[in-house]
């Protein structure tokens, strides 16, 4: 069958059809996006400009913050502008690029969270060999692996979609281009493509979740052998990570580990993992982590002192 593609652009339905609600959402999500940028940039700068960057855990945390900024920036700016726009359109090429970006940075974040769980496992269960196992070369290779894995996943998703014919309609009941809403617009049978898309996303999400579950199960068992202070410190750092895993994996599992169907709740769930989660990341890691808070106080307190002294 020859591919027929009469669609040159798509039209988003957006978050709401009510102008009043859209104005409120514009203010709220503009504020959220600013928090995402400032909060994650603060973590990146604090880690990179302090001794924390030498620690594998904070090395990965800085890149997690970077990915969070990129991940939310794929969808948030366009969504915010569209909230006040009469025509919420995106070109066909722009749609495919957005689909790629969402899955690339989303999958990369999953892999980084998995690597961070392994890092905590080595730190708590094999403390004497920690710096030998998690040396900088190993960390760089792991980080590279997360980016390569994210790229392979997203390129497969996009390749499955671009080979489909789109001849109309071109209205997407969403605020960004994602696989399931776009598949509904293809003018051909998409059952097999939907199964492959779900298998691709499901394998990554389920496989990563199993690794996370095993890592933290072993960690919790090993904590019984440690002192009260050791348990408190370990639970503090692991607690932050577990919180991020739960609030990110929960919505992603609902969206991608299911058949090729769409639900009315999809847009609200998508808001949670594309905007709310990246916004909560800095809060969770700073409020529950004494080392990050102390590094921020020392670094930014010193800078303020130097500026005052210079004047």
UniProtKB/Swiss-Prot annotation:
CDD domains, A to Z: 7tmA_OR4A-like
Alphabetical keyword list: Cell membrane, Disulfide bond, G-protein coupled receptor, Glycoprotein, Membrane, Olfaction, Receptor, Sensory transduction, Transducer, Transmembrane, Transmembrane helix
Membrane topology (Cytoplasmic): 48-55, 119-137, 218-233, 288-311
Pfam families, sorted: 7tm_4
Main location: membrane
Extracellular side: 1-23, 78-98, 157-193, 257-267
GO cellular component: plasma membrane
Membrane topology label: Multi-pass membrane protein
Glycosylation sites: 6
Location(s) in or outside the cell: Cell membrane
Parts of the chain that traverse the membrane: 24-47, 56-77, 99-118, 138-156, 194-217, 234-256, 268-287
PROSITE patterns: G_PROTEIN_RECEP_F1_1 (PS00237), G_PROTEIN_RECEP_F1_2 (PS50262)
Disulfide bonds: 95-187
InterPro entries: GPCR_Rhodpsn (IPR000276), GPCR_Rhodpsn_7TM (IPR017452), Olfact_rcpt (IPR000725), Olfactory_Receptors (IPR050427)
GO molecular function: G protein-coupled receptor activity; olfactory receptor activity
Family membership noted in the UniProt record: Belongs to the G-protein coupled receptor 1 family.
UniProt function note: Odorant receptor.
Protein name in UniProt: Olfactory receptor 4S2
